[in-house]
């Protein structure tokens, strides 16, 4: 106990006030303002530079991104403010085990580029629900999946990131939580609505650089404050809150805090769950989530997509060092606030009786860093928040527009699709803000645990349907649909039980049903996956096999099938959705109106544009990327939606060797920290 109190700790007027009289000074605010201006400048530059007046240009950045902005965007989209707050908070509460998610992600992001992406490119798909529609036929799977993705985005991504970023800004500027959220969204929504995916990727590249510089700086200050890694390992176990009851184990650091692999029955992250149960949601996130896949599809070719995945995989080594370890340092320096164990005390400290570990990272920034660097770290947190939100907004609007709206209105003009996509972003924002109070009260005050629990209940069935669709040619629509429905039904039941039977505080008896109390969410992930695979297999074998058109170019074994040339269909005759599942480059599904503005629709809507328009109308058209469209403009020639899967042999070999090195690096980290 003496070691923890002897650590450098700023004087506090009230030991339970987490941020006493501590707010940003003029120098910090100047850095933050400069950051906002810089991001807006980059966002507006990319808005002007890139082609935003087509659906492909808006949703796929024109398909001409090189490897480094793709890799930076993959990392920035993954590491949002929820990561900074959540990983540091879980590190403070339970140790390094949460870093297993990051090391696991190294394998999954490589699987995306080397295994799944060639299938998506060969099948000429641009959204994940569209892949299932082409692979299995029909529309019920794609619609179910589109609705599920939007649900997951709202309840585990957007609201979590907004809450995490708002915690930081609320504590540093002493603003109301919701006012903080609205202020952040104003800038975020502006360049997402205006610029599309290109603006998102370019600003992500900038924000990745800012995140890394700021986070590495704070890591240096953190380790210096406790005497390096040796000091951290020694003092962490002495970081106890002063008001803890001597007869209680509440508030004690875990004995296995510095181990990734933990007891299979009694620990917070059992090792079988880490090895198997964790890999399944990770596979869903990196290989089938629209937010991530959309960035890789925007690459100019498969080699650039692989380069982006390699860059993201190497960057995934860093969160343990720049987030988890600093969170543990925060517990050492500020045990009474970060490690509070009494609900009344926690309520007083952070307005959350479940626990205050989520203030670990903001606490470090505001108490440890000098003026100027505090402003830089504020910029880092805002960068993390904005990069995640813009990515999710763009991908969610892509799914809604291309998979749901296009199903309802298959003949919708390109102009209509562009407007619908942008309006949906605004609707997403509203729903997500309303969900924040539920996030605030969930999972014992550990934000990252909340995210992973919901992921383990909803994502495994989807992941298994994708895996079977990609690697088992016999899987058919009936098997995939009923496997998905049964898996999601079980997942939603467990999710509802978790919200009804909230985990009790440390000193209270646990009277929850055994299925909630004794079945860890990672084990439940394994159960869901097994049920889904069994259902898909049995139903597929009992029903008719899929046609050749549903397999060609859409599985790993058929991705290189020869393309069957078909007669050109006149542009004025749109293909109905029923003819859209042959899987070739010429297969125009309802959602692939990315290639041309249909001549008939163009003429029908040309009368809407009057020769003279007010300045307000012209400004709105520019914001939506639809300015200056001539009514006499000839239809654009058809262009391939996605790149080829062919690669330069030398570049391919170089990438493969680099991939093996990255895998060896991941295995070393697993072994060293296991």
UniProtKB/Swiss-Prot annotation:
Summary of the tissues where the protein is detected: Expressed in brain, lung and kidney. In the kidney, strongly expressed in the cortex, at the luminal side of proximal convoluted tubules and in BBMVs. Weaker expression observed in the medulla (at protein level).
A molecular function GO annotation: D-glucose:sodium symporter activity
Catalytic activity reported: myo-inositol(out) + 2 Na(+)(out) = myo-inositol(in) + 2 Na(+)(in); 1D-chiro-inositol(out) + 2 Na(+)(out) = 1D-chiro-inositol(in) + 2 Na(+)(in); D-glucose(out) + 2 Na(+)(out) = D-glucose(in) + 2 Na(+)(in); D-xylose(out) + 2 Na(+)(out) = D-xylose(in) + 2 Na(+)(in)
Swiss-Prot/TrEMBL keywords: Apoptosis, Cell membrane, Ion transport, Membrane, Sodium, Sodium transport, Sugar transport, Symport, Transmembrane, Transmembrane helix, Transport
Bilayer-crossing regions: 28-48, 57-77, 103-123, 141-161, 181-201, 209-229, 273-293, 309-329, 376-396, 419-439, 447-467, 480-500, 522-542, 654-674
GO cellular component, one term: apical plasma membrane
Subcellular location: Membrane; Apical cell membrane
Membrane topology term: Multi-pass membrane protein
Family recorded in the similarity comment: Belongs to the sodium:solute symporter (SSF) (TC 2.A.21) family.
Biological role: Involved in the sodium-dependent cotransport of myo-inositol (MI) with a Na(+):MI stoichiometry of 2:1. Exclusively responsible for apical MI transport and absorption in intestine. Can also transport D-chiro-inositol (DCI) but not L-fucose. Exhibits stereospecific cotransport of both D-glucose and D-xylose. May induce apoptosis through the TNF-alpha, PDCD1 pathway. May play a role in the regulation of MI concentration in serum, involving reabsorption in at least the proximal tubule of the kidney.
Protein name: Sodium/myo-inositol cotransporter 2
């Amino acid at each position: 106990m003496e070691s923890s109190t002897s650590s450098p700790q700023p004087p506090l007027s009230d030991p339970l006030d987490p941020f006493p009289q501590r707010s940003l000074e003029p120098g910090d605010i100047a850095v933050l303002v400069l950051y906002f201006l810089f991001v807006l400048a980059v966002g507006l530059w990319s808005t002007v530079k890139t082609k935003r007046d087509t659906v492909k240009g808006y949703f796929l950045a024109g398909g001409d991104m090189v490897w480094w902005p793709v890799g930076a965007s993959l990392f920035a989209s993954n590491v949002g403010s929820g990561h900074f707050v959540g990983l540091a908070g879980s590190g403070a509460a339970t140790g390094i085990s949460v870093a297993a998610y990051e090391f696991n992600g190294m394998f999954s992001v490589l699987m995306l580029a080397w295994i799944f992406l060639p299938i998506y490119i060969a099948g000429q798909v641009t959204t994940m629900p569209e892949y299932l529609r082409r692979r299995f036929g029909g529309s019920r799977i794609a619609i179910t999946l589109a609705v599920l993705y939007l649900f997951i985005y709202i309840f585990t991504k957007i609201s979590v990131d907004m809450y995490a970023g708002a915690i930081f800004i609320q504590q540093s500027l002493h603003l109301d939580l919701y006012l903080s959220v609205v202020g952040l969204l104003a800038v975020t929504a502006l360049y997402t609505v205006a610029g599309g995916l290109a603006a998102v990727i370019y600003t992500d590249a900038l924000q990745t650089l800012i995140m890394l510089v700021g986070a590495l700086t704070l890591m240096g200050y953190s380790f210096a404050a406790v005497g390096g890694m040796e000091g951290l390992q020694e003092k962490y176990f002495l970081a106890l809150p002063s008001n803890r009851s001597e007869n209680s184990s509440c508030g004690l650091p875990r004995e296995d805090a510095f181990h990734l692999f933990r007891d299979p029955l009694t620990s917070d992250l059992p090792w079988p769950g880490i090895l198997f149960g964790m890999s399944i949601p990770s596979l869903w996130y990196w290989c089938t989530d629209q937010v991530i896949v959309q960035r890789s599809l925007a690459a100019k070719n498969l080699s650039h997509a692989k380069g982006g995945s390699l860059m993201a995989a190497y960057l995934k080594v860093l969160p343990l060092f720049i987030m988890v370890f600093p969170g543990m340092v925060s517990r050492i320096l500020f045990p009474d606030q970060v490690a509070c164990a009494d609900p009344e005390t926690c309520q007083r400290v952070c307005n959350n009786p479940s626990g205050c570990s989520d203030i670990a990272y903001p606490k470090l920034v505001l108490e440890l860093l000098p003026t100027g660097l505090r402003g830089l770290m504020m910029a880092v947190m805002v960068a993390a928040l904005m990069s995640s939100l813009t990515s999710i907004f763009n991908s969610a609007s892509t799914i809604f527009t291309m998979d749901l709206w296009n199903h309802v209105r298959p003949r919708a003009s390109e102009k209509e699709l562009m407007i619908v996509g942008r309006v949906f972003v605004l609707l997403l924002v509203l729903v997500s803000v309303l969900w924040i109070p539920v996030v605030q009260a969930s999972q014992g005050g550990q934000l990252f645990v909340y995210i992973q629990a919901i992921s383990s209940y909803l994502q495994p069935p989807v992941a298994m349907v994708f895996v079977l669709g990609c690697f088992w040619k016999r899987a058919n629509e009936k098997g995939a649909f009923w496997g998905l429905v049964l898996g999601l039904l079980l997942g939603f039941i467990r999710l509802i039980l978790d919200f009804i039977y909230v985990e009790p505080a440390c000193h209270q008896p646990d009277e929850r049903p055994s299925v909630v109390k004794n079945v860890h969410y990672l084990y439940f992930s394994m159960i869901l996956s097994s049920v889904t695979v069994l259902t898909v297999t049995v139903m597929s074998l009992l029903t008719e096999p899929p046609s050749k058109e549903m397999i060609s170019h859409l599985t790993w074994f058929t991705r290189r099938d020869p393309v069957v040339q078909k007669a050109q269909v006149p542009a004025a005759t749109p293909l109905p959705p029923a003819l859209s599942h042959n899987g070739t480059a010429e297969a125009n599904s309802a959602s692939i109106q990315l290639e041309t503005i249909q001549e008939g629709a163009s003429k029908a809507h040309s009368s809407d544009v009057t020769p003279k328009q007010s300045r307000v109308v012209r400004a709105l058209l520019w914001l939506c990327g639809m300015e200056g469209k001539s009514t006499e403009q000839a239809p654009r020639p058809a262009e391939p939606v996605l790149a080829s899967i062919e690669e330069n042999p030398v570049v391919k070999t170089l990438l493969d060797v680099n991939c093996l090195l990255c895998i060896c690096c991941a295995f070393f980290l697993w072994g060293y920290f296991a």
